């Protein structure tokens, strides 16, 4: 059961850096719905992409799976036999709840839930990889190496879904979308104190990139095609395609 997010409703004397701990995991479904515009749409459409790209006898990776929302969306939409989903997160609290969520919904496609560092996971025989608001929590210097590894592990015709919070090279546009996101959180019941305290905790651990920077990394990794397929304010999702025809 998810609880309402009130983690930052009272002043916190010492704000440390953000962690996906037990307290965050407990309120995460409410938190992300009220904080990330378009999140439900992205989750639903990841399932639609899975229906299009997942191939029989291949694997799907959900890297930074949190509570398993993207994993479940993929599994509901797989139309082939002998597929497997590997869901990975480094937060013990998230993984514990993810396993419970996955087990609560029965489906023929098996899911392996792994507690671990996504940088250490071997990607192989993949028809689809999902990075749903995950890359932004890696050090910028480590992001290219992960994308390189994903590209190598994808089969020809495979797809990477990369959802992120964006920064903008045009400062005026960036300010507008930042303020609209602020309005979105206020409209969802967050106070100025809650918004400010959460932002202070995230600013050192969530480092955002522009869409242009993401596309440049994807090209460098080898992806022949990439495009923004969803955006709401300063949040969105890209799809990157590996050339070739799925076997």
Swiss-Prot record:
Its EC number is 2.1.3.-. It catalyses: prephenate + S-adenosyl-L-methionine = carboxy-S-adenosyl-L-methionine + 3-phenylpyruvate + H2O. GO terms for biological process: tRNA wobble uridine modification. Catalyzes the conversion of S-adenosyl-L-methionine (SAM) to carboxy-S-adenosyl-L-methionine (Cx-SAM). NCBIfam families: carboxy-S-adenosyl-L-methionine synthase CmoA, PRK15451.1. Homodimer. This is Carboxy-S-adenosyl-L-methionine synthase. It comes from Salmonella newport (strain SL254). The gene is cmoA.
